[in-house]
């Protein structure tokens, strides 16, 4: 019976690790999609990406479809990983083995932390993508209104020129903001990679500590002996100092 429950726990851990690996790859691709969308809108800043007839619209709709598809896939993976974590939580409560319960809870907490990080990263990247797309739609609408006004009136007066200059200035500022967002997202990907590496190192250290408890016990005894020797040495030095002072003032 114990072997069966142990195999069930290991199977859940295997499923969790597999889903976490899939989510990691999906989130990296999702972040790159958002970055490429930002770069494409920045490259089109010098010309109206909404005034052309077919190609930009097709590219935009293709990216939108890809975004929706990847978002659905990531949400499904997050839901599956949540289900596996819930099963692991049920197992820890019904294991009935106090000596193993702490180790199981520690493993479960690590998987929960990873799920929380992936969920936060997904929602943040999705929000950035939606903000960029809404901003592009707004700027394209303004540009179309300006072009419609120019073609309808046929008068290139001073007010229109000032309005266009202000619009171009806003687009340049928007391009700088998008470049800053891209740099921040690249930095975030690097930090995420380093965080995963540190978690892996921490997990290996915990595994070694749990596998070799005698090493921890030996280190604690050595530290205790050092502390005791320091106290004895300090006491001897204090007594000698007092005796010397008494002798000097005698």
Swiss-Prot record:
Membrane-spanning ranges: 230-250
InterPro entries named in the record: Golgi_SNAP_su1 (IPR023601)
Gene Ontology BP annotations: endoplasmic reticulum to Golgi vesicle-mediated transport; inter-Golgi cisterna vesicle-mediated transport; protein transport; retrograde transport, endosome to Golgi; vesicle fusion
UniProt feature, compositional bias: Basic and acidic residues: 41-51
An example molecular function term from Gene Ontology annotations: SNAP receptor activity
Chain coiled-coil ranges: 9-30, 68-95
Location of Phosphoserine modifications: 141
Post-translational modification N-acetylalanine, affected residues: 2
Segments on the Cytoplasmic face: 2-229
Membrane topology of this protein: Single-pass type IV membrane protein
Keyword Translocase: no
Region (Disordered): 37-59
Subcellular location field: Golgi apparatus membrane
Keyword terms, alphabetized: Acetylation, Coiled coil, ER-Golgi transport, Golgi apparatus, Membrane, Phosphoprotein, Protein transport, Transmembrane, Transmembrane helix, Transport
Keyword Transmembrane helix: yes
Recorded GO CC terms: cis-Golgi network; cytosol; Golgi apparatus; Golgi medial cisterna; Golgi membrane; membrane; SNARE complex
Role according to the record: Involved in transport from the ER to the Golgi apparatus as well as in intra-Golgi transport. It belongs to a super-family of proteins called t-SNAREs or soluble NSF (N-ethylmaleimide-sensitive factor) attachment protein receptor. May play a protective role against hydrogen peroxide induced cytotoxicity under glutathione depleted conditions in neuronal cells by regulating the intracellular ROS levels via inhibition of p38 MAPK (MAPK11, MAPK12, MAPK13 and MAPK14). Participates in docking and fusion stage of ER to cis-Golgi transport.
Protein family membership: Belongs to the GOSR1 family.
Subunit structure as annotated in this protein's UniProt entry: Component of several multiprotein Golgi SNARE complexes. Identified in a SNARE complex with BET1, STX5 and YKT6, in a SNARE complex with BET1L, STX5 and YKT6, in a SNARE complex with STX5, GOSR2, SEC22B and BET1, and in complex with STX5 and COG3. Interacts with GABARAPL2. Interacts with the 34 kDa STX5 isoform.
Name of the protein this chain belongs to: Golgi SNAP receptor complex member 1
Organism: Rattus norvegicus
Gene: Gosr1
